[in-house]
Amino acid sequence: MAETAYVPRLREQFDREIRGKLTEQFGYANVMQVPRLDKVVLNMGIGEAVNDRKKAETAAADLALIAGQKPIVTYSRVAIATFKLRENQPIGAKVTLRKAKMYEFIDRLINVALPRVRDFRGLNPKSFDGRGNYSLGIKEHIIFPEIDFDKMGETWGMDVTVCTTARTDDEARALLTAFNFPFRQ
């Protein structure tokens, strides 16, 4: 009795529709040339963690709820006296998502979290880095449904970087548009 393995909705959509569309649009000779999602990196920098270590731990716990896997706490590398920052102090958290968790996160980001942003007019189409990767900033992490709004003491921003195997920004934009990323016109 062989049960089929779980495949995220966006991965299935990529295999069925998007791959063929991109091959036709850009004229790829090989299936492996078609750009695909590589990883998603979530980063939370907590400036207030300089004075209170618990804020970095709270941010890491929230990031774990959002991402579905344990984040790495990031530490300062150098001491900066003007910020009262010493070396090796916790100042944030980051997590890298790949495979199924990556597709699930992007699905929740596009369909649930971004529509909850106040005054959302679309994503900036100029936030590509020139090598096919896209970065966006989120001002309040409470837009994710995993975070309980009533229990939140503070809200923090976070960076989301979507890394693709695309070689150019045009290929990456076509890939992310096919995944229904709401780019501004």
From Swiss-Prot:
TM region positions: none
Swiss-Prot/TrEMBL GO biological process terms: translation
Annotated InterPro entries: Ribosomal_uL5 (IPR002132), Ribosomal_uL5_bac-type (IPR020930), Ribosomal_uL5_C (IPR031309), Ribosomal_uL5_CS (IPR020929), Ribosomal_uL5_dom_sf (IPR022803), Ribosomal_uL5_N (IPR031310)
Gene Ontology CC terms: ribonucleoprotein complex; ribosome
Claim: rRNA-binding is one of the keywords in the record: yes
Keyword terms, alphabetized: Ribonucleoprotein, Ribosomal protein, RNA-binding, rRNA-binding, tRNA-binding
A GO term for molecular function: rRNA binding
Domain of life: Bacteria
Pfam families, per the entry: Ribosomal_L5, Ribosomal_L5_C
PANTHER family in the record: 60S RIBOSOMAL PROTEIN L11-RELATED (PTHR11994)
Subunit note: Part of the 50S ribosomal subunit; part of the 5S rRNA/L5/L18/L25 subcomplex. Contacts the 5S rRNA and the P site tRNA. Forms a bridge to the 30S subunit in the 70S ribosome.
Function: This is one of the proteins that bind and probably mediate the attachment of the 5S RNA into the large ribosomal subunit, where it forms part of the central protuberance. In the 70S ribosome it contacts protein S13 of the 30S subunit (bridge B1b), connecting the 2 subunits; this bridge is implicated in subunit movement. Contacts the P site tRNA; the 5S rRNA and some of its associated proteins might help stabilize positioning of ribosome-bound tRNAs.
NCBIfam families in the record: PRK00010.1
Family membership: Belongs to the universal ribosomal protein uL5 family.
UniProt name for this protein: Large ribosomal subunit protein uL5
Annotated source species: Rhodopseudomonas palustris (strain BisB18)
